[in-house]
Swiss-Prot record:
Residues 81-102, 435-476 are annotated as: Disordered. This is Retinoic acid receptor gamma. GO terms for biological process: cellular response to corticotropin-releasing hormone stimulus; regulation of transcription by RNA polymerase II; retinoic acid receptor signaling pathway. Residues 206-440 form the NR LBD domain. One of its GO terms (cellular component) is transcription regulator complex. Residues 110-175 bind DNA.
């Protein structure tokens, strides 16, 4: 019986954990996940394998168990010698039960708004929203105004309604200005010490010059948020309506001014005016909504859920809806929120706007190859600049480019919205807005849309896509 057992255990054809001559269905439950990964026969030492079986073993298995005990005491069996060499105690094979994970740390609710706290920030328990609001307010030296009695209730529902009272509440509960300043200085020092730019980020002089020109063109045609004197209006601020005519008049006026600034931006881009007038018009009409959306979305303030126009007018989400955005509103605000993690500066926004504009895949271009050649250095410039600015985040450049696809989708829906908007406004669509839309015939029944090549002869005499005549007035 012993010899038979040895043959069963040491047979060359026996797979790991399976004794020849016995069906595998008898004992597979004895192998835990850890045992299956053990060296061959490791679990046989000290009867550890059979200890895991129930007491009512089949007769053959009980006999094999006794034989195994005798075989392990034999020092002259080659097979058993191998078993003893590789065996370990059964105690070593039984994994100790893992210690339970520590309970999650629970913080007191946010001292400012009573929302769920994410930890202690600037001296007190606070949520991410109030932490970010306090940090930005201190770093940017923001000055807020309360339109009531300077005693507004601040909670997680009302915290965005009055910045003045929210900031005062931050101070009242103990948030520290100095903690913000020290944290900022510490981060600056760490960045200065740790970030060493590799030689590959050294730009050629011509690329540096291109970046400076594009950045200057953007900044001089689109003031940044911190440069604006923000003001608000109470017009239809709390409830969505189909259209607020007062807000629409203001919005259409500001949009017209923005379009003029985009044309000015385009004319200042290196190489743009070397294109044919027809191609300049095609590119501007195709990309104008893209750039308008990109620009307004960079002026999004998440704490107040507002957007600010170039004259400082600041509208909340409801007012933007009522001003004419309508069903497009939430899509635009969602895109603005997605831009925040990119932390794009003016130079990156300008370069991305230029790439949106000078794009060789637009329809009806006369010289698409020339347009593509103008776009190539802009792509390289944005790639180099983004990597030089964030050497530890090489993925930022492709993420920025992906936003162009999102912008085109929004612009398509924006053009559709303009068609329905025509039915809601009492008068005609402002001429420059109408001109910049890709399908102006939608606003005039039976009107034929001239192709850029057909219009170039009449507009080239003015020398400008905006149609400036010799007196300086603009004609749509």
């Amino acid at each position: 019986m012993a010899n038979s057992s040895k043959e069963r255990l040491c047979g060359a054809g026996a797979p790991l954990g399976h004794a020849n001559g016995f069906p595998p269905s008898v004992y597979p439950f004895a192998f835990s996940g850890g045992i299956r990964r053990s060296p061959p026969f490791e679990v046989l030492a000290n009867g550890g394998f059979f200890r895991s079986f129930p007491t009512d073993l089949p007769k053959e298995m009980a006999s094999l168990s006794l034989t195994m005990g005798a075989a392990e005491r034999s020092a002259h069996s080659d097979c058993i010698s191998t078993v003893e060499t590789q065996s370990t105690s059964s105690e070593e094979m039984v994994p100790s039960s893992p210690s339970p994970p520590p309970p999650p740390r629970v913080y007191k609710p946010c001292f400012v708004c009573n929302d769920k706290s994410s930890g202690y920030h600037y001296g007190v328990s606070s949520c991410e929203g109030c932490k970010g609001f306090f940090r930005r307010s201190i770093q940017k030296n923001m000055v807020y105004t309360c339109h009531r009695d300077k005693n507004c209730q601040i909670n997680k529902v009302t915290r965005n309604r009055c910045q003045f009272c929210r900031l005062q509440k931050c101070f009242q509960v103990g948030m520290s200005k100095e903690a913000v300043r020290n944290d900022r200085n510490k981060k600056k020092k760490e960045i200065k010490e740790e970030v060493v730019l590799p030689d590959s980020y050294e730009m050629p002089p011509e690329m540096e010059e291109l970046i400076q020109k594009v950045s200057k063109a953007h900044q001089e045609t689109f003031p940044s948020l911190c440069q604006l004197g923000k003001y608000t209006t109470n017009s239809s601020a709390d409830q969505r309506v189909q259209l607020d005519l007062g807000l629409w008049d203001k919005f259409s006026e500001l949009s017209t001014k923005c379009i003029i600034k985009i044309v000015e931006f385009a004319k200042r881009l290196p190489g743009f005016t070397t294109l044919t007038i027809a191609d300049q018009i095609t590119l501007l009409k195709s990309a104008c909504l893209d750039i308008l959306m990109l620009r307004i979305c960079t002026r999004y303030t998440p704490e107040q859920d507002t957007m600010t126009f170039s004259d400082g007018l600041t509208l909340n989400r409801t007012q933007m809806h009522n001003a004419g955005f309508g069903p497009l509103t939430d899509l635009v605000f969602s895109f603005a929120d997605q831009l925040l993690p990119l932390e794009m500066d003016d130079t990156e926004t300008g370069l991305l706007s230029a790439i949106c504009l000078i794009c060789g895949d637009r329809m009806d271009l006369e010289e698409p190859e020339k347009v593509e050649k103008l776009q190539e250095p802009l792509l390289e410039a944005l790639k180099f600049y983004a990597r030089r600015r964030r050497p530890d985040k090489p993925y930022m450049f492709p993420r920025m480019l992906m936003k162009i696809t999102d912008l085109r989708g929004i612009s398509t829906k924006g053009a559709e919205r303009a068609i329905t908007l025509k039915l809601e406004i009492p008068g005609p669509m402002p001429p420059l807005i109408r001109e910049m839309l890709e399908n102006p015939e939608a606003f005039e029944d039976g009107a034929a849309t001239p192709k850029p090549s057909e219009r170039s002869s009449s507009e080239s005499s003015n020398g400008s896509p905006t149609g400036e005549d010799s007196s300086g007035s603009k004609t749509p």
